[in-house]
């Protein structure tokens, strides 16, 4: 078990000074580009590396950067771990790194680059070997997906052989097959080709290799199926655990990556359903994910006029942002200055100016421009028509 309680960052990346508190379940970090969302995840991940290399950089305005986390384990006692960073070049080591890096086994990291292409398997290999060194490396660089296909086909073949898979392995494999269709019920696992070792997926357009799914679907598979595979490998020598019983830490950068808005909210429910006991710290740019999260699961960041990153105060409401529009979330939660296009703002400004000046020619010119822009059911259309009608012209 591993739960991050608190994070303090000073002088790392674009962050001058920041303190964050996390809950034991989902923590969804949102905010504008450059606010430091990825830096937060990188800083946490680096705390469970060996410190020999660093992908985080000190803030150029500081002589050194520092990071400290407070966390709890099975014994429910609070521990602290910290590092100091003075270097600025790529892959320089941390100047000082203290704490229990052996906890890296409990940390699973997903970077923003989550794609994969077709892999040809000429034969099946044994399960990928794990080691403390690999856990430390993965905490900084993120887990790999190249061995998922071998894992899945291995479990598929031996699931048909008595007493070859444990009960835990069978349940995890069933979860893996079910998850192909959990975002879209028109997609499901079909079979494995015996002559080529290919995973076949049934879709509404026919059967395809699983590597031929859309980028969004593959990004989801990378996370969900990568988690199942990784948890099995990491805890195999401990008797194995079901994915739903994993109580470690999961870091996911850009959880909404490549996902259609229809799937973004589903992804929140899915990951909480599959990992009810894990702590998940993820970043997002998606207002649809913000809508789907509970209010205590959100960490909204902003940047003030002094370029300092701060945590936005969110309303403590029972239903979170489930009743808010996307535009309201973008502006009031995620810090977007304007949700309308510059062309629209120019057109509506010109229309209002022409009304004030009672310039009929420009009024009608601006009106027709807005008429071509607005959504057919936009209620503003009716108001614009009423305003134009004051000048003796009826618009059908």
Swiss-Prot record:
<dbReference type="Pfam" id="PF13304">
    <property type="entry name" value="AAA_21"/>
</dbReference>
<dbReference type="InterPro" id="IPR003959">
    <property type="entry name" value="ATPase_AAA_core"/>
</dbReference>
<dbReference type="InterPro" id="IPR051396">
    <property type="entry name" value="Bact_Antivir_Def_Nuclease"/>
</dbReference>
<dbReference type="GO" id="GO:0051607">
    <property type="term" value="P:defense response to virus"/>
</dbReference>
<protein>
    <recommendedName>
        <fullName>Septu protein PtuA</fullName>
    </recommendedName>
</protein>
<dbReference type="GO" id="GO:0016887">
    <property type="term" value="F:ATP hydrolysis activity"/>
</dbReference>
<keyword id="KW-0051">Antiviral defense</keyword>
<comment type="function">
    <text>Component of antiviral defense system Septu type I, composed of PtuA and PtuB. Expression of Septu type I in B.subtilis (strain BEST7003) confers resistance to phages SBSphiC and SBSphiJ. May be an ATPase.</text>
</comment>
<dbReference type="InterPro" id="IPR027417">
    <property type="entry name" value="P-loop_NTPase"/>
</dbReference>
<keyword id="KW-0378">Hydrolase</keyword>
<dbReference type="GO" id="GO:0005524">
    <property type="term" value="F:ATP binding"/>
</dbReference>
<dbReference type="InterPro" id="IPR003593">
    <property type="entry name" value="AAA+_ATPase"/>
</dbReference>
């Amino acid at each position: 078990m591993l739960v991050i309680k608190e994070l303090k960052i000073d002088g790392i990346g674009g962050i001058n000074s920041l303190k964050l508190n996390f809950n034991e379940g989902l923590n969804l970090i949102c905010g504008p580009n450059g606010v430091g969302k990825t830096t937060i995840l990188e800083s946490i991940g680096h705390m469970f590396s060996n410190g020999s290399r660093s992908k985080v950089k000190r803030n150029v305005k500081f002589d050194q950067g520092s990071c400290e986390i407070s966390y709890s384990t099975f014994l429910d006692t609070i521990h602290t771990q910290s590092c100091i960073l003075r270097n600025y070049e790529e892959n320089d080591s941390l100047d000082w790194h203290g704490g229990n890096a052996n906890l890296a086994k409990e940390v699973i990291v997903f970077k923003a680059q989550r794609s994969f292409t077709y892999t040809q398997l000429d034969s099946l290999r044994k399960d990928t070997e794990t080691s403390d060194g690999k856990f430390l490396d993965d905490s900084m660089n993120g887990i790999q997906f190249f061995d998922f296909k071998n894992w899945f086909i291995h479990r598929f073949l031996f699931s048909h052989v008595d007493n070859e898979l444990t009960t835990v392995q069978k349940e995890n494999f069933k979860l893996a097959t079910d998850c192909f269709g959990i975002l879209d019920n028109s997609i499901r696992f079909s079979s494995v080709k015996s002559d080529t070792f290919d995973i076949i997926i049934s879709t509404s357009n026919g059967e395809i290799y699983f590597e031929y799914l859309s980028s969004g679907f593959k990004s989801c598979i990378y996370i969900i199926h990568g988690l199942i595979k990784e948890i099995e490998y990491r805890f195999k020598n401990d008797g194995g655990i079901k994915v739903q019983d994993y109580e470690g830490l999961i870091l996911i950068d850009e959880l909404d990556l490549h996902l259609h808005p229809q799937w973004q909210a589903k992804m929140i429910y899915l990951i909480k359903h599959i990992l009810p006991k894990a702590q998940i710290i993820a970043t997002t740019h998606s207002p649809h994910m913000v809508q789907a999260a509970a209010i205590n699961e959100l960490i909204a960041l902003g940047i003030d006029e002094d370029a300092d990153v701060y945590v936005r105060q969110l309303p403590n409401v029972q239903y979170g942002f489930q009743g808010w529009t996307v535009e309201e979330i973008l502006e009031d939660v995620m810090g977007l200055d304007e949700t309308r296009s510059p062309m629209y703002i120019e057109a509506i400004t010109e229309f209002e100016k022409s009304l004030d000046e009672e310039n009929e020619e420009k009024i009608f010119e601006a009106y027709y421009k807005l008429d071509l822009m607005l959504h057919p059911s936009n209620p503003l259309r009716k108001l614009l028509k009423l305003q134009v009608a004051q000048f003796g012209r009826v618009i059908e």
